[in-house]
Amino acid sequence: MNGGGRRRYSSEQLMFDVPANAGGGAGKWGQRGGVRRGDGEIFVSVEPTTPARLRGGEAAAAAAGESPGQRQQLSPGLLDLHAFDTELISDFQVPGIGMYDGAQKFGYGNGGFDDSDPTFAPNKQMSKSTVFAESNFLKAFPEKEKAAPVAKIKVVVRKRPLNKKEISKKEEDIIDIEQQSNSLTVHETKLKVDLTEYVEKHEFVFDAVLDEDVSNDEVYRETVEPVVPAIFNRTKATCFAYGQTGSGKTYTMRPLPLKASQDILRLMHHTYRNQGYQLFVSFFEIYGGKLFDLLNERSKLCMREDGKQKVCIVGLQEYRVSDVETIKELIEKGNATRSTGTTGANEESSRSHAILQLAIKKRVDGNDSKPPRLAGKLSFIDLAGSERGADTTDNDKQTRIEGAEINKSLLALKECIRALDNDQTHIPFRGSKLTEVLRDSFIGDSRTVMISCISPSSGSCEHTLNTLRYADRVKSLSKGSNTKKDLSLAAAPLRESSPSLLASAVPSFSSAEVMNDITERSNFGWTKQQYVKEHQAPTFVDRMQKVKEDTEFSLSNGGYFKEQRTKGSVPVGIAEVPDTVYQQGRQPTRKARDLTSDNNMRNSIAYPIIRRVVPDEDEHLNELLQEEEDLVSAHRKQVEETLDMIKEEMNLLVEADQPGNQLDDYITRLSGILSQKAAGIVDLQARLAQFQRRLNENNVLLYAQCP
């Protein structure tokens, strides 16, 4: 990126020059599309239905005063639907609302949509005729082309301020944020071979980056507000927060549902008045692989799939609401019931994944006797924080089991994202209850917003980098093209550890030239991470990359992989094998090795051991949870049988008090009842003893502490 107001983007994006003396929006670029006239004036379109982008001949036609809809002949390459900006905007025109004027009606600030997006300058206005002309221009394309798939996931990163605990430890803020370019830099302190410290920089670029001074209102306007109108058009929108424990996920997510419900009710009472829409609220959590209703005294729920492979929560109680105060009371009730605990990293850590759903349903033909039909849904998911065993050494065994279950579900979520990113035919959504709930967030007509919460302290540097890499993989998720298999045969690109601003300056190519390109671009326009496949490296590189990703959220307390090199450390044109080192516990200082010994060390990494340990721990955890459920079920059955036998004993006593009773019959029946009770107790004791032995074998038995 050069100075003087000149910015260069890929050929799918709008590229224009703004004079240095241009006031107001100098240097800004239109995300929805734009036309540059000969005199340098820029018209930016923010029409929410189809973000068209005019280039080449359209710009000349617009400068001449000719409407794009009047062009009868459309030459190839005029409109690249795969290069649309992927900001989460609804796919329909709201009746009575044009150019997002409705955002001013129910916004929380005095400004409109332009104020909430830093890429739109306040003085950049546009005429409605330009928008309507672009809409007519798109009508000339076939429906199949207009429905071309684009990325539907927006990734926002929020940085929290240093807390008192970090300040008392004199930890430093290692994250620098540039909101103008939506980028951030992590300054990681490392040690050289001679034990001298040096700082390594990791650069990331996302759809939006928010610093510690941003309020929750601004977070809402940046993330959830643009997708609220879409849920009235059979769209399922999801907003979830991800990050390490104590990074501010619950603080970020707590006010968002209330603000979204205010906007939904306002749209229902104004824009969609008398159309039969109703709003329903439900709130449940996933704790230890089980589902509990937070609005119904934590009653246990079951997750099922219907014939259309849609996830249904059996027994979930929904409340129909019509005002904001009722929603606020329900949210506070659910938050008070949610499972929380104290860990070494956070005093009030969320030990469960909480899911709040705002469902919009519509009456069928205006008939109240029939159940309403689902029109759209907005889900808010507050994920439990990812953590390592080293962070929870001062906690009991139950806390460690909770952490293992949390990490297992987050690992399953990462596997689903990786499968979608690699265009695999099978997506392992059934790996955990969390991924089953999130199935609708990644497939079908969906809109997803991911808020990655990061800690700025130097002590959380490793967690922060893992969170940012996780978010970067979600950001690169795009179903718009299947060119990965073809690109794998092309020349090897420069390996990078993270996306950078430098990568954004590399121009992309048209669909005819993509096959010859050595880099692959997502719909956001940033270079996606790829590793070198050359000579004998492919098998080793693929294997090591998979090991690193599989063990990033490992259930073990010790080993993990950590990248030793970052982008920019290799000259252009030189292939490099990913340099990963298996480590146990804390990271030791790495001594210098020559290339031969380094390769031998890599080949000797215990890859089968890692692949063998993690499934065993998963299997043991699943077996313990299943045995716990069996024990509780057996106990419940024993209590029910005991109640039935008590009723029978009471009837037997009544008969014994009657004159002329048969003593032999009384003795026989009483003996049978006592034998049945004794057999049930012995069976339950045997189950309990077996479960205690299993807990002792796995060193997870909890003993009550004496006062």
From Swiss-Prot:
Annotated disulfide bonds: none
Coiled coil (residue ranges): 619-656
Binding site for ATP: G243, Q244, T245, G246, S247, G248, K249, T250
Keywords: ATP-binding, Coiled coil, Microtubule, Motor protein, Nucleotide-binding
Signal keyword on record: no
GO cellular component: microtubule
Single annotated GO MF: microtubule motor activity
GO terms, biological process: microtubule depolymerization; microtubule-based movement
Pfam families named among the record's database cross-references: Kinesin
Residues annotated as transmembrane: none
Domain called Kinesin motor: residue spans: 152-477
Family assignment from sequence similarity: Belongs to the TRAFAC class myosin-kinesin ATPase superfamily. Kinesin family. KIN-13 subfamily.
Protein known as: Kinesin-like protein KIN-13B
Protein source organism: Oryza sativa subsp. japonica (Rice)
